[in-house]
Amino acid sequence: LYFKDDDSRLSFLQGNYITLTNMSDDDVDRIIRYHLEPINISFHTTNPELRCKMLHNRFAGEALKKIDRLYEGGITMNGQIVLCKGVNDGEELERSIRDMMKYLPCLQSVSVVPVGLTKYREGLYPLESFTKEDAKEVLSIIHKWQKKAYDEYGYHFIHAGDEWYILAEEEMPEEERYDGYLQLENGVGMMRLLQNEFAEEYAGLEGDDTEREVSIATGVLAYPLICKMASAIEKKYTKTKIHVYGIRN
């Protein structure tokens, strides 16, 4: 068995995202020849110099040319951009989305998610958390390009991670905007799917008077939604008490 973080075989087999930095021309030829798809690509930016900096790899910018070959070979692709404040957001994000649009329809979806930050960052690049205003700006950019993609190709193409809507205190898009949840494992549409599935199941519950006490642990971002669902359950199951705990990473 051969496992490697940037192994293209794990991309189409298991959905791993790869940067293409260690992919040879032979690898690209094999993908095209056997039509191994979809290939999931970590773009992060289409600015070659910035990509080298972000990935700490001098070949990262040159690797973007491999996407041209995959596109010419008709290979279905998905992409992701992990957004870092002051690095690849703003005008750089606009540039990246504009550049990626040329790969439609082979590039069927791209997710934009905020970089995950924890308190354990000693010796790492100094990154800041996004604010509510930042999130609104990111959503504004994404919604603009969504409309353009939908008008031209009939699908939304570029998708914002759920965190942006929560941070911006905006409603999650309706299910149709997610194009079949192509980026679900990247945290795109999870909250909408959960809300819809909960509503469907909840409508069929009759409730009872059995005494229960339940504890649920969840992340800070999902905490308000889980609390809302727990409250709804308690109203139907009057002797059930649900404790929801938001865990900060």
Give the predicted meaning of each segment:
Residues 42, 113, 161:
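Conserved residues at the C-terminal ends of beta-strands
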Residues 102-103, 117-249:
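Auxiliary Fe-S-binding modules of radical SAM enzymes
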Residues 1-106, 116-144:
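Conserved Radical SAM active-site core
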